[in-house]
Amino acid sequence: MGLERDGILSQDLHFNEVFVSLWQNKLTRYEIARVISARALQLAMGAPALIDINNISSTDVISIAEEEFKRGVLPITIRRRLPNGKIILLSLRKS
């Protein structure tokens, strides 16, 4: 019984490592929504746009924030805390 438990525990650890490696450079839909809404608020409060807004069909702040996100020009870093206490930093700016 102790061996089965250790086997399950090692499988869980392996699953967590695989999960972290797969999702390390991807954002969840909740993170994307949070980033776009935060940037839209900044734009609404008067922050300058990081892209040329003349090339965008719609000039509302959410569309501008979405386009900035798609182009990868946002200087925002997301900090993820994993259950094991490890912290992963994800930069949204594309090199």
From Swiss-Prot:
It comes from the Archaea. The keyword Cytoplasm applies. It holds the Pfam family RNA_pol_Rpb6. Its EC number is 2.7.7.6. It is found in: Cytoplasm. GO terms for molecular function: DNA binding; DNA-directed RNA polymerase activity. Keywords: Cytoplasm, DNA-directed RNA polymerase, Nucleotidyltransferase, Transcription, Transferase. SUPFAM superfamilies: RPB6/omega subunit-like. GO terms for biological process: transcription by RNA polymerase I; transcription by RNA polymerase II; tRNA transcription by RNA polymerase III. Gene3D superfamilies: 3.90.940.10. GO terms for cellular component: cytoplasm; DNA-directed RNA polymerase complex. InterPro entries: DNA-dir_RNA_polK_14-18kDa_CS, Pol_omega/Rpo6/RPB6, RPB6/omega-like_sf, Rpo6/Rpb6. Part of the 13-subunit RNA polymerase complex. DNA-dependent RNA polymerase (RNAP) catalyzes the transcription of DNA into RNA using the four ribonucleoside triphosphates as substrates. Belongs to the archaeal Rpo6/eukaryotic RPB6 RNA polymerase subunit family. HAMAP family: RNApol_arch_Rpo6 (MF_00192). This is DNA-directed RNA polymerase subunit Rpo6. The gene is rpo6.
